[in-house]
Amino acid sequence: MSDPSSINGGIVVAMTGKDCVAIACDLRLGSQSLGVSNKFEKIFHYGHVFLGITGLATDVTTLNEMFRYKTNLYKLKEERAIEPETFTQLVSSSLYERRFGPYFVGPVVAGINSKSGKPFIAGFDLIGCIDEAKDFIVSGTASDQLFGMCESLYEPNLEPEDLFETISQALLNAADRDALSGWGAVVYIIKKDEVVKRYLKMRQD
């Protein structure tokens, strides 16, 4: 039996810049080596917080719906949008609740704190252990390749356009070296007052 989190393939990467943060994913949905769709986005947003989820596609969809419900409930109770740091704790506790029958996912959180304006990124394992970073977080079937590309290309305090170029090159080159991811990509550049979404074309083989 293969690892359930690699059956459908897919990758997510997040990077911090100067007063900005970027998160990107590929668009492939597969069933091992069989391609199913090239329009499967793995990044979701709840207010100004972004969540990328790799892993088993059914769990990705389930978690998106669950976090949509929980963040809407939070907004009703607290009368404010959830901050990235708070959302990270919510993701962690939600995954840990299911530790004996876990969701087979690798979530990545990215966002800008609305008060301090500081960029924030964090990753998790499938039972909710938090991995905060100041530079980049990777997840998915090409995570080894992404680590190599990010360590080669990343520089601290990049401007938004330079950050877009860096995260795009890292994702495109990593996906080219992994049979289970690719088929296009989507990149979000998040600043305090705006979000830019761009699609990248990739090889379709």
UniProtKB/Swiss-Prot annotation:
Subunit structure: The 26S proteasome consists of a 20S proteasome core and two 19S regulatory subunits. The 20S proteasome core is composed of 28 subunits that are arranged in four stacked rings, resulting in a barrel-shaped structure. The two end rings are each formed by seven alpha subunits, and the two central rings are each formed by seven beta subunits. The catalytic chamber with the active sites is on the inside of the barrel.
Annotated GO CC locations: cytosol; nucleus; proteasome complex; proteasome core complex, beta-subunit complex
Subcellular compartments: Cytoplasm; Nucleus
Protein name as it appears in the record: Proteasome subunit beta type-3
Cited function: Non-catalytic component of the proteasome which degrades poly-ubiquitinated proteins in the cytoplasm and in the nucleus. It is essential for the regulated turnover of proteins and for the removal of misfolded proteins. The proteasome is a multicatalytic proteinase complex that is characterized by its ability to cleave peptides with Arg, Phe, Tyr, Leu, and Glu adjacent to the leaving group at neutral or slightly basic pH. It has an ATP-dependent proteolytic activity. This subunit may participate in the trypsin-like activity of the enzyme complex.
Domain of life: Eukaryota
Positions bearing the Glycyl lysine isopeptide (Lys-Gly) (interchain with G-Cter in ubiquitin) cross-link: K70
Annotated source species: Saccharomyces cerevisiae (strain ATCC 204508 / S288c) (Baker's yeast)
Keyword field contains Nucleus: yes
Pfam families the record matches: Proteasome
Modified residues (Phosphoserine): S31
Family per similarity comment: Belongs to the peptidase T1B family.
GO MF: endopeptidase activator activity
Keyword Electron transport: no
Gene: PUP3
Alphabetical GO biological process terms: proteasomal ubiquitin-independent protein catabolic process; proteasome-mediated ubiquitin-dependent protein catabolic process
Coiled-coil zones: none
Keyword line: Cytoplasm, Isopeptide bond, Nucleus, Phosphoprotein, Proteasome, Ubl conjugation
